[in-house]
Amino acid sequence: MRLPNKYALTFPERRPTPVRPLALEEIRRLDFAEPEFRRFPCLTLALESGRRGGLRPAVFNAANETAVKAFLEGRVRFTAIPRVIDRTLRAWDKTPVQDGRTLASILAADAWGRDAARRMMEKEKP
């Protein structure tokens, strides 16, 4: 994970790294483990949104991007991110429009999610 983390921390630049590129042909075995849902609550929210479908994944993504941006700007704590997403999704679940197969409906859900997440963050303290 060093290389993806480095890319995330130095984006949009690409800085040199002493880490060797991954050579899949050298790996003899890959081990997979159950996700740690308690440790990563946003994973639970993402999977639940995908299972429910409709426009909920678009709202999840919008709330996530908005909350992460606020964290990176120092406006909310890291631990606020899942709370903001969860509260945004709960508010979305109460709206009458839950499905849409057009680009316009997806963009509207995205805008709704961003606006709702911003309102949720007004209640959060950095």
Question: Which residues are covered by each model-predicted region?
Answer:
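Catalytic, metal-anchored helix/loop core of enzyme active sites in primary metabolism
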Residues: 1-126
